[in-house]
Each structure stands twice: as structure tokens, then as C-alpha cells.
Amino acid sequence: SEMCIRDRSPINSPKTIADNKYSEIQDDKFQLQPGDIIVTKGPVMWGFFGHCSIAIDDKTILQIEGPGDKPTTQSFESFKYNYASGKNDWMKVYRCSYPGAGKKAAEWVKKNYENTNHRYLVTLNLNSKKFTYCTKIIYQAYKFGVSEKSVKSYGLHIISPYAIKDNFIDPYKLRLVKAY
């Protein structure tokens, strides 16, 4: 078998750890798909660990970051730099295994959250859109954009970023497609 040897020569210009790590992750040939769910370490807010966003096409993610914020879109490349290039950062990309589900979820998010004034607030109501948070957008995208059968059903509930994958039901289960 052939072995690939990477050039480990010293870098001439002084760079930060983030720049070095980012140069490794930026041209990784990974192809994002609409509906992909990106989970990161993120800041710890309100006792929540982690952060997540959803791909609305093959280059763009939509997220809502924190108190007072509205949903924003960002290129996947810059999102990777922000959330996956730090020394202790990590990022996982999950994909719904059900054919066509990701595209439907992405369309729903574009229609219901892109360029809206919905605000960040963690509430127990998983059905409302006026106040939302990172995982709630993803949960709704699959529940309302794909199928009520794709995710677990709750009364009043909060879903944390690290628990998002556990809320999907067969045959809609998420699979890990990329880790940074």
C-alpha cells in the first residue's frame, strides 16, 4: 500500500495555532450538504454545553448564537475557522440518513428563519418560532420540514446541543460524516 508523506517543513511566517489548524481543515475536500447538522464545543451559556448550526445549502450555515441575537447565516468556511480552529476546539458534522430529508429541512429553515427577527431565548416550547435557540431550529426543521416522525415528540422540553443526535428516530437517525 502507498503511504502519503506530508511535508512537515517549518513554516516561515509566524502563524497562530488557529491559522495552522485552519490551514489543515480548510481544503479538506469535505462536501457539506443541505440539512447537515454541525455540533461544536461552543461557549457555555446558561448551563448549555456546545453549539450547533444547520447547513441551508452546500456552502452556508444558519445559526442563532446567544441572548439578543437573531438567526444569522455564515459561510461554512468561516464557521469552521470560528469554531474548529482553536487548539481545544472540535466540530462534528452529522447527516440525516433518510434520503432527501436534509434538503427538506434546509428549505424549511430558509423559509422560516433566514432573514427573520426571531430572537434567541431558551424556552420550553419546542413549537414556537418567535423565541428560539440553536438546537430548537434544527429540531423544528426536521419535525415540521421533514416529518413529525423524524424526531422524538415532547411536551415542554429543552434540547441541548450535545443531545440533538439522540432526538432523531429511525429511519431518520443521524450519522457522523465529518469530525474536525
What are these regions (language model features)?
Residues 30-96, 119-129:
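Glycine-rich catalytic cores of cysteine/serine-nucleophile enzymes that process amide/ester linkages
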Residues 57, 66, 110-114, 139-147:
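Sec-exported extracytoplasmic/periplasmic mature domains
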Residues 84, 98-117:
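A structural motif
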Residues 32-36, 50, 102-106, 110, ...:
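Extracytoplasmic/secreted envelope proteins and their assembly/folding machinery
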Residues 12-30:
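Mixed-charge, Lys/Arg-rich low-complexity intrinsically disordered regions
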Residues 7-8, 93:
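Low-complexity basic/metal-binding stretches
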Residues 9-16, 124-180:
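Activation targets extended, charge/polar-rich intrinsically disordered C-terminal tails
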Residues 1-5:
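Short, small-residue-biased leader/transition segments that mark boundaries at the very start
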